[in-house]
Amino acid sequence: MTAASGVRMYSKAQAQNSQEQLIQRYAPLVKRIAYHLLGRLPASVQVEDLMQAGMIGLLEAAKKYDAGKGASFETYAGIRIRGAMLDEVRKGDWAPRSVHRNTRMVTDAIRAIEARTGRDAKDHEVAAELQLSLEDYYGILSDTQGSRLYSFDDLLQDGEHGLPEDTSLSHNEPIHGLLDERFQAALADAIAKLPERERLVLALYYDEELNLKEIGEVLGVSESRVSQLHSQCAARLRARLADWRSA
């Protein structure tokens, strides 16, 4: 064995030991994030799959962490772990094309109504625009709630037409570029102009990270009604940010 090969073997062994220590130390963090997310995800998602993806996110965090940027490793790792888990869940999005089509129909209807009236589209107006009964409209909202509501990125996607790459809110690097700043401002403005109850649903779901059942208890409505409110809120934001989404 040459000296160079000996150094390489030593370095490899050190890296492996460091990796194992990292996993042992932060495995509880991965587990905690996995179980926290599980309550907000479809029943088909297995916690073991989340934890496996989270471990990959943890290792990626270890490779890319830069202490000079100010965040603690645990904070940075938490973001990467959660992102890796959500990426894994997104891979399993097998919602029928009809669901994505209905999502776009609702978005287009809301946009048309609000362009005509200059105010928030009401439930019965959207149903009438789609030539549906109110009950059938609520059924569509319940169907479209399912697969992609884990982050603001997902909130603004309809399954086939998402955000422009440069405006992705799941980007883990610092906000960059004028386009991104303008989009963030447009999103903040669109959220501020939502009906009060829809704003509250957003805050409880994304900021407080409550699940739909818990939000229903706060609002005094059923879980299915919260699902409808969330889907309608998502469609309203997609309608108001349509120019950004088609950029």
Curated annotation (Swiss-Prot):
Residue span of region Sigma-70 factor domain-2: 22-94
Chief location: cytoplasm
Chain segments carrying region Sigma-70 factor domain-4: 190-238
InterPro entries, sorted: RNA_pol_sigma-70_dom, RNA_pol_sigma70, RNA_pol_sigma70_r2, RNA_pol_sigma70_r3, RNA_pol_sigma70_r4, RNA_pol_sigma_FliA_WhiG, RNA_pol_sigma_r2, RNA_pol_sigma_r3/r4-like
Molecular function as annotated in GO: DNA binding; DNA-directed RNA polymerase activity; sigma factor activity
Record localization: Cytoplasm
Cited Gene3D superfamilies: 1.10.1740.10, 1.20.140.160
GO cellular component, one term: cytoplasm
Listed Pfam families: Sigma70_r2, Sigma70_r3, Sigma70_r4
SUPFAM superfamilies in UniProt: Sigma2 domain of RNA polymerase sigma factors, Sigma3 and sigma4 domains of RNA polymerase sigma factors
Motif extent (Interaction with polymerase core subunit RpoC): 49-52
Gene Ontology biological process terms in this record: DNA-templated transcription initiation; positive regulation of cell motility; regulation of DNA-templated transcription
Region (Sigma-70 factor domain-3): 102-171
Keyword field contains Zinc: no
Keywords: Cytoplasm, DNA-binding, Sigma factor, Transcription, Transcription regulation
Residues of the DNA-binding region: 212-231
Source taxon at top rank: Bacteria
PANTHER family: RNA POLYMERASE SIGMA FACTOR FLIA, SIGMA FACTOR F FLAGELLAR
Family membership: Belongs to the sigma-70 factor family. FliA subfamily.
Function: Sigma factors are initiation factors that promote the attachment of RNA polymerase to specific initiation sites and are then released. This sigma factor controls the expression of flagella-related genes. Required for the flagellin gene (fliC) expression.
Record protein name field: RNA polymerase sigma factor FliA
Protein's organism: Pseudomonas aeruginosa (strain ATCC 15692 / DSM 22644 / CIP 104116 / JCM 14847 / LMG 12228 / 1C / PRS 101 / PAO1)
Gene: fliA
